[in-house]
């Protein structure tokens, strides 16, 4: 990825801001691996920036191509029904930007393999018991 490339980690969002903390950690890890790209987390709802705001901010930094990575387990109603409207908003907010959509994270075999490995070896979380 080049400096003119943006990567948006697109997440659902939640009213409790602590919910987003793992996604910010993931953003930092992605930014380390794609050092030349602008990497942000954008929210479907209950968080800022939304997709259009993130796209506009990237366009203001001369980003010309944005890859949107939906961090959803599957292509449910939000990705099938809500996302197209949000993408239209992003295209209006950043009309000179080319957008590319990755598959939903949970539909990727490498992600499923990593989750299977985690599920088998997951440590106990006594803080939530």
Mark where each language-model region is.
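Active-site-proximal alpha-helix that buttresses catalytic centers in soluble enzyme cores
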Residues: 1-129
């Amino acid at each position: 990825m080049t400096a003119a490339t943006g990567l948006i980690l697109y997440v659902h969002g939640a009213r409790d801001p602590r919910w987003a903390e793992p996604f910010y950690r993931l953003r930092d890890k992605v930014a380390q691996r794609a050092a030349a790209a602008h990497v942000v987390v954008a929210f479907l709802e209950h968080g800022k920036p939304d997709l259009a705001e993130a796209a506009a901010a990237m366009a203001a930094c001369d980003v010309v191509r944005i890859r949107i990575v939906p961090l959803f387990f599957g292509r449910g109603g939000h990705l099938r029904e809500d996302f197209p409207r949000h993408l239209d908003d992003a295209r209006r907010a950043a009309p000179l930007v080319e957008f590319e959509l990755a598959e939903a994270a949970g539909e990727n075999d490498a992600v499923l393999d990593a989750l299977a490995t985690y599920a088998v070896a997951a440590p106990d979380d006594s803080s939530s018991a």
